[in-house]
Design a protein with these regions (language model features):
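Structured secondary-structure scaffolds
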Residues: 1-262, 279-314, 326-335, 431
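Basic, alpha-helical terminal appendages of large translation-related enzymes
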Residues: 30-81, 86, 95, 201, ...
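Membrane-interfacial helix termini and the short, flexible loops that connect transmembrane helices
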Residues: 150, 269-273
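Short amphipathic alpha-helical leader/targeting segments
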Residues: 174, 178, 212, 268, ...
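A broad, low-specificity signal for short, low-complexity segments enriched in glycine/proline
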Residues: 215, 268-270, 339, 393-394
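C-terminal, low-complexity/hydrophilic appendages and adjacent surface loops
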Residues: 264-266
Length: 435
């Protein structure tokens, strides 16, 4: 019916009367056809009718509203779902209460932010269209409930975050109608040329992509990770299936750092193998950064930092034959919010039975952060040749000298062959040579 019924009836004089509380809730009838009646093409005087108007046994009702039984006509319009959806967050707090929509003590426990201005739900994530639809009405209803003393906070939501759209190619035929994107082959649909557009993925543009194919090819964790890695969460981002391979490889490398694929055995060393000092510092820099990035919803940057740490673990495995448990376990815990299925499997392989959901996020070692040097990979014309360790305050000239003094770099290039040294602070140093 596109919404909840108004608890209103009309008397014989067509005057509205509220249904008393003892007769609530008003239950909607079961009907065979929910479609509304629209204007008749051949009758200019016709009027549209809601589907409830055809439920005559429900519409005409005899009620005793305090002055004896009388016949009334029920309101056949409905509230367009706002009445139910605008306060759902309050009902979620106390869904089993059959006397109140929420217990006041329960509402205060969850919604009161300890004196912080506004209070309300900690975080609301929704599209920008919600601002003029659901959020507008939810805020109105909440303020009414606050004025009536039923809720403890003047605002329903403490923080609002608008996520961007996922965009995909959409196609229109010569007359401008959208055609199924999946059925376009070589720029044509059923033999006709089409025009390509980039638009919001969805039914209206017929350019939706089923996640089932991604699940089958790469698994659910890869899809989750790819969506978070596409770019800032609040930006519109184009769907690029070829990029899925990159995050899939990250998860594969993480798996291989923990599990020997030939034997199926865990390849993580016990407490006897300590991480190198640079790897230990990088671990705690990553913990500190990813903790903050998760709180800021900057998942794409967090994935980049986790990838860098995992690459460092890969090099450690290559050089020393095993991954240090002291690094791998925090890495798995940090990956868990993004790739929960793989993380849970790895956690069990590491010998743990406790669910990851019950564990605290890793804590960074303040000393490692305070004295942290910066480890920079060094490439020559884009090819990795080693890494250097510099102080966190090292200037460009110091980084340049250290990079050019690195053994493999010094053997490959002389000072006269260096065209320029590109330093991306905290990330990489690339030595570009003259042709």
């Amino acid at each position: 019916y596109w919404g909840e019924p108004f608890p209103i009836v009309y008397d014989e004089n067509d005057l509205p009367v509220a249904v008393p509380e003892s007769m609530l809730p008003v239950l909607l009838p079961e009907v065979d056809d929910y479609s509304p009646k629209t204007f008749a093409d051949d009758d200019a005087d016709s009027a549209p009718e809601p589907p409830l108007s055809r439920a005559t046994e429900w519409t005409t009702v005899e009620l005793d509203l305090g002055d004896g039984p009388k016949k009334y006509r029920r309101e056949t319009n409905t509230m367009p779902n706002w009445a139910g959806s605008c306060w759902y967050y309050l009902r979620y707090l106390d869904p089993a209460d059959d006397r109140r929509f929420v217990d006041p003590a329960v509402e205060r426990y969850w919604m009161d932010r300890g004196g912080e201005q506004g209070g309300g739900v900690d975080l609301y994530i929704g599209g920008v269209e919600q601002a003029v639809l659901h959020l507008l009405y939810a805020r109105f209803w909440h303020k009414v409930l606050f004025d009536l003393g039923h809720v403890s906070t003047p605002e329903p939501f403490h923080r609002l975050y608008n996520q961007g759209y996922i965009l995909a190619d959409a196609f229109t035929d010569p007359v401008g109608r959208y055609v199924p994107a999946a059925e376009v082959v070589d720029g044509r649909y059923q033999g006709q040329p089409v025009t390509r557009h980039l638009g919001k993925m969805g039914k209206s543009l017929k350019n939706g992509v089923s996640p089932d194919d991604i699940y089958q090819a790469y698994g659910a964790d890869t899809l989750r990770l790819y969506e978070m890695a596409m770019g800032p969460l609040d930006d519109d981002r184009p769907w690029q299936p070829d990029d899925i391979v990159g995050v899939f490889r990250f998860l594969q490398r993480l798996w291989r750092n923990v599990v020997d694929e030939e034997t199926g055995q865990t390849r993580v060393a016990g407490t006897g193998l300590a991480p190198s000092e640079p790897l230990y510092r990088q671990l705690h820099q990553t913990i500190d950064a990813v903790d903050a990035l998760y709180r800021q919803l900057r998942y794409n940057v967090a994935i980049a930092r986790l990838t860098e740490l995992n690459n460092a673990v890969t090099r450690h495995v290559r050089d020393r034959g095993a991954a240090p448990r002291e690094v791998v376990e925090p890495l798995v815990l940090m990956v868990a919010p993004l790739a929960p299925h793989l993380a849970a499997e790895l956690w069990e392989r590491l010998g743990h039975q406790d669910p990851l959901d019950d564990l605290a996020f890793p804590t960074a070692d303040p000393e490692a952060l305070a004295t942290a040097a910066v480890v920079l990979p060094v490439t020559v014309d884009g090819r990795r040749r080693g890494e250097i360790t510099v102080g966190p305050d090292a200037d460009e000239e110091e980084v340049r000298r250290a990079a050019l003094a690195l053994g493999p770099v010094a053997r490959l290039v002389g000072e006269g062959r260096v065209a320029r040294v590109v330093h991306v602070p905290g990330r990489i140093v690339n030595v570009v040579t003259r042709a």
